[in-house]
Amino acid sequence: MTSRIERRTQAAIAVLGAGFALAGAAVAASADQERKPRPVRASVVGSAEFVLPYHQDKDVRSFTFDAQAAPYSRPLPGIPGGLPTDARGTVKVSHYSAERDITYTSKGRVDCLVTGVRTATLTAVITEVSPGGPPIVGKRVGFSVHDGGDSKGEGEGGGKGRSKDRVGFSWNGVNLLPKGTTPPEEAPVGTCMAPAPYAPVTEGGYVVAHAELPSPPPSPKGSTEPAGPAPK
């Protein structure tokens, strides 16, 4: 009888031990998931319509982004190794004019991207404009994005889709150079320069994947020049 009781006790201890081992593994797996590294490369993707808070009309405006960081990939004079903010990808701007009943579009090539937690600025050089659009081919324009999260989950509240997202852009009076008594001119846009995301998204949304700006890669063997820009 004693032997049978001992065997049952040992079996119960073994089962409990296995349970604790499984629980420990689950906790460890959960901790590993929480410690997952951030994306190696930053990105901004998505398409959304938005409204201008300072101008109400029936026009339909939208931006589409497919931008990825490509650090140290765009050599510049004096900076042969490029910059940590270098990027690639595309942007598309669409503007339906209710007054003219026509949609104007333009496309651009991304050249710079910087991200923070749920926020980003990027710039692109316009490569294509639809007939009747402004003569801006070759011009750099800037955009900013606030990723408000999924409004059904971790976002800031209700609304349709990702309607807590916001965008900003570098034209329509937010990037001017006042010159005394003469009318101000629109200022040139530098890489990664854009105003804060001031325009609320009404449909669609964006996803910002944040990654820290990386250090320059090692200099090529035998080279005395740094691979990236020298800190000042």
Give residue spans per PLM region:
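Predominantly extracellular/secreted and cell-surface proteins with exposed
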Residues: 59-142
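Serine/proline-rich low-complexity intrinsically disordered segments, especially terminal tails, linkers
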Residues: 45-49, 64, 221, 225
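Extracellularly exposed regions in secreted/surface proteins, prominently low-complexity, repeat-rich
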Residues: 151-232
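Acidic, glycine-rich flexible loop segments
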Residues: 114-177
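C-terminal region of N-terminal signal peptides and the immediate post-cleavage residues
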Residues: 22-47, 53-55
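Short, flexible beta-strand-to-coil junctions
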Residues: 49-54, 96-97, 147-149
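Secretory targeting and sorting signals
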Residues: 1-32
